[in-house]
């Protein structure tokens, strides 16, 4: 045996020699441990090594191991200038879009960004990353990204990296724990390998890369050099070792035979008193109901698995709490954990759903309690006073005012008032319709395709609200004046040179003798065409005559463009000192001290200096939870009614509780909709009036008789009579959303807003994009005139509603002709003519998938759902005006779209039911189509559910109960 151990020792010595040679090879590559840089001296030395390597070596490797919580990321490594924070090199992980961003300064001094595709690394598990920066001594730079030892992406022919400053003390190395946008998880290692191969870099992070020929030959050569002199000796020793094992095997066999004879003799000897051994499973040592099986191993038995709903080793079992492990019930508090199982309590009041109970975590995860809202307004015959408004909300309902045409309240009842049908004569024009106002007055409005004051109406070819010829109106109403552009919509009637021809149809709008297509100041006379900069705007109309600024943006409207204005927002603080350069904030409040003022900070309470907002929902990524219980587009942490959809977030008394879930909106002590102890309902729900004075006993208090929301705009002209925050249609303030932000030839839309925000023009043949207003709505009526003012294009345009973020919105879009999209990657998309209504719920967000899905006429799984399409399959006509009317009631999922050509309705979606978005913002949409006009835009708050919805609601309830 001693000789055998000697042979084994010799073999181990040989193997250790090989391992030692490999280990020595690993140490040949210089490595900088970034996490170990503790003082300035160490940092300077590291920068000097790195700077020399970037000049003399071909490759440098960034290596790290880390953990990231779901959807979080940050900067992994960065090289910055200590004096001005200039980036030399920065590597950041963008987990929400599964990308690694590499930013570096090129030799020409400009910042270059490379987006590299990465698998999901934000899952809470350990991850390894290697970034190879190659081609350092060549004309072009190359990048290779390895995630968990596999090549994830690469980029070739990149511009070279700029040299680091000669003075190493000017450069600061920041790791993910010290960067501005720090890593949100934990970082175990962060190293820089200076030179070497991918295999050697992999060896430093325990990544056994295969196929690296150079590394393989090095190791193989070393093994041969070490084993070459010992091969014969090693073979001889192994032969001896094999002989010893054979002899040992024979000895063991003899011992087994002898022990068997002794055992049989003992068992057959009755005098010894041995008896049949008792069963280890009697009595059953296992948990009640668990099977027992005898074994030869200690303790002589083995228990089966614990019963369903329990966990343990079979001997001891304890109950599993399915409520905490799986949360199967509609609300966490409704789950009751029982011995071996769980039971869900009944659905909350105002909701309906089948009972649910079961056993085990797997069952609880695969079966969820479903509770659907009961529409008391439909199911309860007398939920509210007859002829009053009943508003269904999730789990309940509330009673509003009397319906249009009735007067009174919930206590006294609602009685008929003067109405259009009860009039002894019709005061409206034959081409107009009667409209009942909130206060009971009657007014007239011209039908679509006609314009005037309602009492007198004339033909309106371009449907912009002005008649083709002037009308003899008694009140000299402005909409009785002749349209200065009969065939091109221009609801603002702009006429720069006052020649009676509107700017939209005037070939020389400013009257300077130079045609618009050649004029560098289309609306300002400038015969000399002087242009001191290079932005295509002449000095006479350029708000920055000596500084190029294509967008001519002027945030503070002081006549000086942002590009040359040292105080862009006009708050008295210069841009270089202003923590919100484009939003007035003279107090400069900055609660999270991230250098961005609260007035413009997308996360005012959490530091986020980069202000990234991937999904364009106006909430920064670092504080964006995407948890929205009621689906109204506001995450629960920012929602003033987290369980009731209320996109408008109206809070009339500023008590932090939204009006839709506040029993006393104006905080005057009078309940809004129900009488409590003889008090209420409030006859002025939004204006404090404890005395409830109502001189004419019409059910509306004196203080809100003609201005219900007290916003100084009479209800007759107020587009939202029950919201003091919205008074007129206005898109002058809007958010631009680019739906395909990456591409070879990126052309973004150019939006021009006219007529005080009631007309929008898009001039470019652009990539898909949106212009979205900042006002969010619950129920809304949205209408406008659509006109393509060109004959050279045939693509898509339309309007949007229910916008919550760049992955969640509704779009009404129209294509002129059938066409296959010219980029077949990631999939072939076919557009068809005809008006379409789509619900966008995109898993990927802005990019090539959403782009092709919008172009495609049908459904695209995980991206876009087609809700309705005009069966006529008719495209829009060049230079032809159309009027669309849209109604959306998100509380019940009601959607209806109507389209008019002239005065004739040519398309009607009928009632469409969809609850993908429970409210949101409004805007317009374009995709590869130029010269689009959205004119005479109007929106109006309206939560009243139309009568044509009732039959659809019954069908929905019947389907749920079955």
From Swiss-Prot:
<feature type="domain" description="TSP C-terminal">
    <location>
        <begin position="732"/>
        <end position="946"/>
    </location>
</feature>
<comment type="subunit">
    <text>Oligomer; disulfide-linked.</text>
</comment>
<feature type="repeat" description="TSP type-3 6">
    <location>
        <begin position="612"/>
        <end position="649"/>
    </location>
</feature>
<feature type="disulfide bond">
    <location>
        <begin position="323"/>
        <end position="335"/>
    </location>
</feature>
<feature type="signal peptide">
    <location>
        <begin position="1"/>
        <end position="23"/>
    </location>
</feature>
<keyword id="KW-0677">Repeat</keyword>
<feature type="disulfide bond">
    <location>
        <begin position="329"/>
        <end position="344"/>
    </location>
</feature>
<feature type="compositionally biased region" description="Basic and acidic residues">
    <location>
        <begin position="631"/>
        <end position="641"/>
    </location>
</feature>
<feature type="disulfide bond">
    <location>
        <begin position="446"/>
        <end position="457"/>
    </location>
</feature>
<dbReference type="InterPro" id="IPR008859">
    <property type="entry name" value="Thrombospondin_C"/>
</dbReference>
<dbReference type="InterPro" id="IPR001881">
    <property type="entry name" value="EGF-like_Ca-bd_dom"/>
</dbReference>
<feature type="disulfide bond">
    <location>
        <begin position="521"/>
        <end position="541"/>
    </location>
</feature>
<dbReference type="InterPro" id="IPR048287">
    <property type="entry name" value="TSPN-like_N"/>
</dbReference>
<feature type="disulfide bond">
    <location>
        <begin position="384"/>
        <end position="399"/>
    </location>
</feature>
<feature type="compositionally biased region" description="Acidic residues">
    <location>
        <begin position="557"/>
        <end position="570"/>
    </location>
</feature>
<feature type="glycosylation site" description="N-linked (GlcNAc...) asparagine">
    <location>
        <position position="942"/>
    </location>
</feature>
<keyword id="KW-0732">Signal</keyword>
<feature type="repeat" description="TSP type-3 4">
    <location>
        <begin position="553"/>
        <end position="588"/>
    </location>
</feature>
<dbReference type="GO" id="GO:0007155">
    <property type="term" value="P:cell adhesion"/>
</dbReference>
<feature type="disulfide bond">
    <location>
        <begin position="306"/>
        <end position="317"/>
    </location>
</feature>
<feature type="disulfide bond">
    <location>
        <begin position="720"/>
        <end position="941"/>
    </location>
</feature>
<feature type="repeat" description="TSP type-3 8">
    <location>
        <begin position="693"/>
        <end position="728"/>
    </location>
</feature>
<feature type="repeat" description="TSP type-3 3">
    <location>
        <begin position="530"/>
        <end position="552"/>
    </location>
</feature>
<dbReference type="Pfam" id="PF05735">
    <property type="entry name" value="TSP_C"/>
</dbReference>
<keyword id="KW-0130">Cell adhesion</keyword>
<feature type="disulfide bond">
    <location>
        <begin position="402"/>
        <end position="414"/>
    </location>
</feature>
<feature type="domain" description="EGF-like 4">
    <location>
        <begin position="416"/>
        <end position="458"/>
    </location>
</feature>
<dbReference type="InterPro" id="IPR018097">
    <property type="entry name" value="EGF_Ca-bd_CS"/>
</dbReference>
<dbReference type="InterPro" id="IPR046970">
    <property type="entry name" value="TSP/COMP_coiled-coil_sf"/>
</dbReference>
<keyword id="KW-1015">Disulfide bond</keyword>
<feature type="disulfide bond">
    <location>
        <begin position="420"/>
        <end position="434"/>
    </location>
</feature>
<feature type="repeat" description="TSP type-3 5">
    <location>
        <begin position="589"/>
        <end position="611"/>
    </location>
</feature>
<dbReference type="GO" id="GO:0061053">
    <property type="term" value="P:somite development"/>
</dbReference>
<dbReference type="InterPro" id="IPR024665">
    <property type="entry name" value="TSP/COMP_coiled-coil"/>
</dbReference>
<feature type="domain" description="EGF-like 2; calcium-binding">
    <location>
        <begin position="319"/>
        <end position="358"/>
    </location>
</feature>
<feature type="repeat" description="TSP type-3 1">
    <location>
        <begin position="459"/>
        <end position="493"/>
    </location>
</feature>
<feature type="disulfide bond">
    <location>
        <begin position="684"/>
        <end position="704"/>
    </location>
</feature>
<feature type="domain" description="Laminin G-like">
    <location>
        <begin position="24"/>
        <end position="196"/>
    </location>
</feature>
<feature type="disulfide bond">
    <location>
        <begin position="603"/>
        <end position="623"/>
    </location>
</feature>
<feature type="repeat" description="TSP type-3 2">
    <location>
        <begin position="494"/>
        <end position="529"/>
    </location>
</feature>
<keyword id="KW-0325">Glycoprotein</keyword>
<feature type="disulfide bond">
    <location>
        <begin position="377"/>
        <end position="390"/>
    </location>
</feature>
């Amino acid at each position: 045996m001693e000789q055998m151990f000697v042979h084994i020792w010799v073999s181990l010595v040989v193997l250790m020699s090989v391992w030692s040679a490999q280990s020595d090879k690993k140490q040949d590559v210089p490595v900088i441990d970034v996490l170990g840089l503790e003082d300035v001296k160490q940092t300077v030395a590291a920068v000097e090594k790195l700077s020399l390597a970037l000049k003399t070596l071909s490759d440098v490797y960034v290596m790290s191991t880390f953990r990231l919580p779901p959807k979080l990321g940050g900067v992994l490594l960065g090289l910055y200038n200590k004096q001005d924070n200039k980036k030399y090199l920065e590597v950041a992980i963008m987990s929400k879009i599964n990308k690694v961003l590499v930013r570096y300064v090129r030799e020409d001094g400009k910042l270059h960004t490379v987006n590299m595709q990465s698998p999901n690394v934000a899952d809470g598990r350990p991850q390894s990353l290697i970034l190879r920066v190659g081609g350092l001594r060549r004309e072009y730079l190359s990048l290779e990204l390895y995630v968990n030892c596999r090549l994830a992406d690469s980029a070739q022919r990149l511009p070279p990296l700029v040299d680091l400053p000669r003075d190493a003390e000017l450069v600061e190395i920041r790791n993910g724990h010290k960067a501005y946008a720090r890593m949100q998880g934990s970082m175990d290692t962060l190293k820089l390998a200076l030179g070497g191969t991918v295999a050697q870099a992999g060896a430093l992070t325990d990544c056994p890369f295969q196929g690296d020929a150079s590394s393989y030959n090095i190791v193989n050569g070393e093994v041969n050099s070490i084993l070459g002199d010992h091969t014969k000796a090693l073979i001889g020793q192994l032969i001896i070792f094999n002989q010893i094992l054979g002899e040992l095997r024979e000895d063991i066999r003899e011992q087994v035979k002898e022990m068997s004879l002794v055992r049989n003799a003992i068992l057959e000897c009755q005098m010894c008193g041995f008896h049949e051994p008792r069963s280890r499973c009697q009595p059953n040592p296992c948990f009640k109901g668990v099977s027992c099986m005898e074994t030869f191993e200690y303790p002589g038995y083995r228990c089966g698995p614990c019963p369903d709903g329990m966990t343990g080793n079979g001997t001891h079992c304890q109950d599993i709490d399915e409520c905490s492990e799986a949360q199967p019930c509609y609300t966490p508090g409704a789950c009751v954990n029982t011995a071996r199982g769980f039971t869900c309590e009944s659905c909350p009041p105002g909701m309906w759903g089948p009972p649910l109970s079961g056993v085990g975590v797997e069952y609880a995860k695969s079966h969820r309690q479903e509770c659907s809202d009961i529409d008391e307004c439909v199911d309860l015959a007398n939920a509210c006073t007859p002829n009053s408004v009943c508003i269904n909300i999730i789990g309940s309902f509330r009673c509003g005012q009397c319906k249009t045409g009735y007067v009174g309240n919930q206590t006294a009842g609602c009685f008929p008032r003067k109405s259009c049908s009860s009039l002894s004569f019709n005061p409206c024009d034959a081409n107009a319709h009667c409209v009942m106002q909130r206060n009971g007055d009657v007014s007239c409005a011209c039908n679509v395709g006609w314009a005037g004051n309602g009492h007198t109406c004339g033909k309106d070819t371009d449907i912009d609200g002005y008649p083709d010829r002037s009308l003899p109106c008694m009140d000299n109403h402005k909409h009785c004046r002749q349209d200065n552009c009969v065939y091109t919509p221009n609801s603002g009637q702009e006429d720069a040179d006052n020649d009676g021809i509107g700017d939209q149809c005037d070939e020389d709008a400013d009257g300077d003798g130079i045609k618009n297509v050649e004029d560098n100041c289309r609306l300002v006379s400038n015969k000399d065409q002087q242009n001191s900069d290079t932005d295509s705007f002449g000095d006479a109309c350029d708000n920055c005559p000596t500084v190029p600024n294509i967008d001519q943006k002027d945030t503070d409207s002081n006549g000086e463009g942002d590009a040359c204005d040292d105080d862009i927002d006009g708050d008295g603080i210069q841009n270089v000192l202003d923590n919100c350069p484009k939003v007035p904030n003279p107090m400069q409040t900055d609660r999270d001290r991230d250098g961005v003022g609260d007035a413009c900070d997308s996360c005012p309470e959490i530091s986020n200096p980069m202000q990234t907002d991937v999904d364009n929902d106006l909430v920064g990524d670092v504080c964006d939870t995407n948890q929205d219980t009621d689906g109204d587009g506001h995450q629960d942490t920012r929602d003033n009614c987290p369980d009731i959809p209320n996109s408008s977030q109206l809070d009339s008394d500023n008590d932090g509780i939204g009006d839709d879930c506040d029993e006393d909106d104006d905080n005057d002590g009078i309940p809004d909709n129900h009488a409590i102890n003889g008090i209420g309902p409030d006859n002025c729900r939004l204006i404090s009036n404890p005395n409830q004075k109502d001189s004419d006993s019409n059910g509306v208090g004196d203080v809100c008789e003609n201005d219900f929301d007290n916003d100084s705009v009479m209800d007759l002209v107020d587009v939202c009579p029950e919201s003091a925050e919205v008074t007129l249609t206005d898109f002058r303030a809007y958010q631009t959303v680019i739906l395909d932000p990456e591409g070879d030839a990126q052309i973004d839309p150019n939006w021009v807003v006219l007529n005080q925000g009631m007309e929008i023009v898009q001039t470019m043949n652009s990539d898909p994009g949106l212009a979205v207003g900042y006002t969010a709505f619950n129920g809304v009526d949205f209408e406008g005139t659509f006109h393509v003012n060109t004959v050279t294009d045939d693509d898509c345009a339309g309007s949007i509603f229910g916008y919550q973020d760049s992955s969640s919105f509704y779009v009404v879009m129209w294509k002129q002709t059938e066409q296959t999209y010219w980029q077949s990657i990631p999939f072939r998309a076919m557009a068809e003519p005809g008006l379409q209504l789509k619900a966008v719920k995109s898993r990927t967000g802005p990019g090539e998938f959403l782009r092709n899905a919008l172009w495609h006429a049908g459904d695209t799984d995980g991206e876009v759902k087609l809700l309705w399409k005009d069966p006529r399959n008719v495209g829009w006509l060049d230079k032809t005006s159309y009027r669309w009317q849209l109604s959306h009631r998100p509380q019940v999922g009601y959607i209806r779209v109507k389209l008019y050509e002239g005065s004739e309705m040519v398309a009607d979606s009928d009632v469409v039911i969809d609850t993908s978005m429970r409210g949101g913002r409004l805007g317009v949409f374009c995709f590869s189509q130029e010269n689009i006009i959205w004119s005479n835009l109007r929106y109006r708050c309206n939560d009243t559910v139309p009568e044509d919805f009732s039959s659809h609601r019954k069908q929905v309830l019947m389907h749920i109960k079955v």
